[in-house]
Amino acid sequence: MEILITYAIIFLLAWGLGAYMSRVFSSERTWLDFLKPLEHGIYWLLRIDPTRGMTWRGYALAILWTNLPLALLGYLVFIWQANLPLNPDKISGMSWDLALHTAASFITNTNQQHYSGQSQMSYLSQLVGVTAMQFVTPAVGLAAMVAVLRGLMGGMGGAKGNLGNYYVDLTRAITRVLIPMSFVLALLLTWQGVPSTFSGAKTATLLEPQTVSAKVISSQTIPVGPVAAMVAIKQLGTNGGGWYGPNSAVPLENPKIGRAHV
């Protein structure tokens, strides 16, 4: 019965979300229209004309232009994280090859991890590097999907060859779909016990000290951080790569059965 209820909830959410996203990308009225000033501020800042349609070539080039600078930013943050803020645990910078692999992996939505985030990434790297790409790459996927559908339906507004404006689609995917849903999901995860803090790692005293190689170990270090914020978009955007090396196998990412349903 529990499985049937879970699938029923998923079906209802998928139907409602699909209808909502259709309105978002069709420029119809939604309950998040109050974000229009923010979106137009982004267009103005980036010198984007939101009314200009794009052909498939223009759309594809715009995707590359968006992804490459973000990958470079992530790479630089990874290798310089030791000298940047939000590093309470004093984690050293990544090697150039590991940083390159990580940036390439997350910007392509491959999300392969050759690192353990809790011990090899600062909070800044986790948020500005990894989490930012976990927002942008699924948003790019949504925008590309919308462009393909417009092409199959004869072009935006019936104008053949007009796939819409990539930057508008990308912005709406982030501001009206991913961020609102991630915000709610992060609150639910925090409620379920997933860490959500900018303080450094915690030290806990063991109830039963252990002896390893003639050395008595009486305490352990528990890495924390703004984990819930990353896990929310990781799951929502079908991203891999969690805050911790073993991902959701770690109790701190997956503390209760309710979190699994979320």
Where are these regions (language model features)?
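P-loop potassium selectivity filter motif centered on the GYG triad
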Residues: P85-V130, S196-H261
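Generic surface-pattern signal
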Residues: S26, R47, S105, M153, ...
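Short secondary-structure boundary segments
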Residues: I10-F34, E39, Q126-G141, A249-H261
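N-terminal alpha-helical transmembrane segments of multi-pass membrane transport
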Residues: M1-H101, G158-G164, V168-P209
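Long, contiguous hydrophobic alpha-helical segments, chiefly transmembrane helices and signal peptides
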Residues: G41, I63-T66, L100-Y115, V128-L149, ...
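A conserved hydrophobic secondary-structure block that centers on an alpha-helix together
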Residues: M121-A201, V250-P251, P255-R259
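Juxtamembrane interface at the ends
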Residues: S22-R29, A147-G154, G241-P246
